[in-house]
From Swiss-Prot:
Low complexity bias spans: 103-121, 222-240, 380-446, 465-495, 655-677
The protein's name: RNA polymerase II degradation factor 1
Organism this protein belongs to: Saccharomyces cerevisiae (strain YJM789)
The encoding gene: DEF1
GO molecular function: DNA binding; ubiquitin binding
Subcellular localization, as worded in the UniProt entry: Cytoplasm; Nucleus; Chromosome, Telomere
Length: 733
């Protein structure tokens, strides 16, 4: 009795102080958990504010009703009274006493009917939340605890709010838990089925009796095991539909990988078969038997053509060999790329097609129906380009070791081929190539900038590496013909170093800020010559200006082109945009001045310094904005932001050029000299070093320049608008 008394006492004094918010929560909770009274819920609602947490606690069993366990025997007195009313659902309202009587009742009819009805309407909805029995019942007689999934103890109240709550639950929960592709159909079906069920159950409740028990167990177990949480009638349907949706693509995806990609005719047959099957399967989605047969047919059909394919492989390879023979007549080098590309095409195109098969069946025809030869030209364009780049550094080596008479007839052919390839490349490939080329061919570009007429023709020369090599082949005979034969060996050696350096730094571009510890210790990166390299290269770009040692002021940044026009006045209009564009390639990330080791160590080679301009953790490695160099170079214009680009950089480097040319030119170098057109002497060893240095430096600079351009134009990339010296930010780290 003590518990009874406590309960009623608690009831009376708590109902007075209920505020409306608590009351609404308790109402919703009693609808969700019909066997919990408001008395049971009051404490929980007062303890936890949030409805969701309360529901979680109750469903997970973390919270249990305090009085439930203690008096099982008392409640049995009430069962016989309640059983008389149990069949009339309209009068049957949620009531804790009823609930307990049902648990312990021995009358199988009343028990099964309530169990049947409640489990359909309610526990199916609860199962969506994957609920275990909410609390530990110790009454010995309730049957269903061992199922673990649904709670038997709920009485049926078919009041409208209750049914509405259930249907709302199913509406929200079905799409989350059901794994089918047909969520929307299922929602509609689930709702209809539930409404129908509730009506039927109200009518048929009294008639159904024991049969219900068996049916219910049979139906519920599969739906529980598959976690299909829709109601009974709709539970098998999603299973069938999802089974069809899952089963039909599988044979396609598996068979596709087996069949070789070259056999276009066979693939077309397969595609037509698959389309037919898709139409069948769409027509017969509800009819499972037809689905199964079509899936089997499909497996057989896809199995047959793949076998035929494997038989037909040798024939098709024969055809491809003929096509390749035709290609050999046109261009010799394309033979290699074509073969490599076909191999790569198998690797590249196979996974793509596999994916398209699974996702959208119809698109396969678009992908496959192109003949593989076209794909060899169109699909992996960037790969073709990379192969070209790897071949071409080797070609100049061979050509320059040959006598010059052989060299010149080969050039027109090679340039033809390169122009063809340039036409093939899509814009993406060019964009990708741009990074690699810029770094690879700096030296040749310097030479090209002397030939202003050619600049006019190829203003976009640094977009296509192939053309640069072609032009280099054209230009080299001119200086070479003025030289003794002994000059060829250092130049071919220089080309070899070009290739080696390119491969050495090849991956620098992909991880712009990354470098490995020994990077600057290598022979290829000569610190002693860096000033000379800078000087020489910029001397070439800026024409004769620095030969006469006049300093170019800030306003004269454009005078690079003016100086170049002393030698070739004709091309002034063409040259000025081209050189202006060419300038940022040479710009140095650390503000024009060239500190050999430390600047590299911090600004360049560590992952912190480079590409992120000013993310908070990296301040120590960046020089502050306002006077960028810590030490002032000759002109006080260093205050610009680091990559302000063309003007500032060309200035600084030209000052250094002018100083170093004063040192170099009086000393007149004894080695054989390449006479550039502007008459400036360049020693081949220096050329080698320019090249290696610039290839590396440019890859670093492109990343830096991109980041800096984004940062300086106010793109929000990191913190970069931060003023390190202002009073506000003084105590920042």
């Amino acid at each position: 009795m003590s518990t009874q008394f406590r309960k009623s006492n608690h009831n009376s004094h708590s109902s007075k102080k209920l505020n409306p918010a608590l009351k609404s929560k308790i109402d919703t909770l009693t609808e969700l958990f019909p066997d919990w009274t408001s008395d049971d819920l009051i404490d929980i609602v007062q303890e936890y504010d949030d409805l969701e947490t309360i529901i979680d606690k109750i469903t997970s069993g973390a919270v249990t009703r305090w009085d439930e366990v203690k008096k099982p025997a008392k409640k049995e007195k009430y069962e016989k009274k309640e059983q008389q009313h149990s069949y009339v659902p309209q009068q049957h309202l949620p009531n804790p006493e009823d609930d307990i009587t049902y648990k312990s009742s021995n009358n199988s009819n009343s028990f099964t009917s309530t169990k049947h009805n409640s489990s359909n309407n309610y526990t199916q909805a609860r199962n969506k939340k994957k609920v275990q029995t909410p609390r530990a019942h110790t009454t010995g007689k309730h049957v269903n605890l061992d199922k673990g999934k649904h709670v038997p103890s709920k009485p049926v109240s078919n009041t409208t709010s209750w049914a509405a709550a259930v249907s709302v639950d199913t509406k929200h929960d079905v799409p989350q838990d059901s794994n089918d592709n047909n969520n929307e159909e299922l929602e509609a079906q689930g709702q209809q089925a539930q409404e129908n069920q509730e009506k039927e159950q109200e009518e048929q409740q009294q008639q159904e009796g024991h049969n219900n028990k068996e049916e219910h167990k049979q139906i519920e177990q599969p739906s529980l095991s598959s976690k299909k949480t829709t109601s009974k009638t709709s539970a098998p349907q999603p299973k069938k539909m999802s089974w069809a949706a899952i089963a039909t693509p599988k044979p396609k995806a598996v068979k596709k990988t087996e069949s070789p990609l070259e056999n276009v005719a066979e693939l077309k047959k397969e595609i037509s078969d698959i389309k037919k099957d898709d139409q069948k399967s769409e027509a017969s989605e509800e009819k499972v038997n037809e689905q199964e047969t079509s899936a089997q047919e499909q497996e057989e059909e896809t199995a047959e053509p793949s076998e035929e394919n494997e038989d037909r492989v040798p024939e098709v390879d024969g055809e491809e060999v003929q096509e390749e023979a035709e290609e050999k007549e046109q261009v010799k080098e394309e033979e290699q790329t074509a073969e490599e590309l076909e191999q790569e095409q198998d690797n590249v195109a196979a996974p793509e097609e596999e994916v398209t098969v699974v996702e959208e069946k119809v698109e396969i025809s678009a992908v496959i129906s192109e003949p593989p030869e076209d794909q060899a030209n169109t699909v992996p364009q960037p790969q073709q380009q990379q192969q070209q780049q790897q071949q071409q550094p080797q070609q100049p080596q061979q050509q320059q070791q040959q006598p010059q008479q052989q060299q010149q007839p080969q050039q027109p052919q090679q340039q033809l081929q390169q122009q063809q390839q340039q036409q093939q490349q899509p814009v993406q490939a060019q964009a990708q190539a741009q990074e690699e080329q810029l770094s690879q061919n700096y030296y040749t570009q310097q030479q090209q900038q002397q030939f202003a007429q050619q600049q006019h023709q190829f203003q976009q020369q640094y977009l296509s590496q192939q053309q640069q090599y072609a032009q280099q082949q054209q230009q080299h005979p001119q200086p070479q013909s003025q030289q003794p034969q002994s000059q060829q060996s250092p130049q071919s050696q220089k080309q070899g170093n070009n290739v080696a350096a390119q491969q050495y730094y090849m991956y620098q571009n992909q991880f712009p800020g990354y470098s490995y510890p020994g990077m600057f210790d290598s022979q290829g990166y000569a610190y002693g010559q860096q000033y000379q390299q800078l000087a020489q290269n910029n001397a070439q770009t800026s024409g004769n200006a620095n030969q006469y040692n006049f300093q170019q002021g800030y306003g004269q940044a454009g005078a690079n082109t003016a100086a170049a026009n002393l030698t070739s006045a004709a091309a002034a209009a063409a040259a000025s945009p081209a050189t202006a564009h060419a300038q940022p390639q040479q710009q140095q990330p650390y503000g024009g001045s060239f500190m050999p080791y430390y600047a590299h160590f911090y600004q360049q080679s560590f992952p912190y310094g480079q590409p992120q301009y000013g993310v908070a953790g990296q301040y120590p490695y960046q020089l502050p904005k306002n006077n960028y160099n810590y030490y002032q170079t000759q002109n006080g214009q260093e205050q610009q932001s680091p990559n302000q680009g063309v003007a500032q950089h060309s200035e600084d480097s030209q000052q250094k050029q002018s100083q170093q040319q004063q040192q170099q030119q009086p000393q007149g170098q004894p080695q054989p000299e390449v006479q550039m057109q502007n008459g400036q002497s360049v020693n081949p060893q220096q050329q080698m070093q320019f090249q290696q240095y610039y290839q590396f430096q440019q890859q670093q600079q492109q990343a830096a320049a991109a980041a800096a351009a984004a940062a300086q134009q106010g793109v929000p990339y990191g913190y970069n608008g931060y003023d390190y010296n202002s009073k506000n930010s003084r105590g920042f780290y």
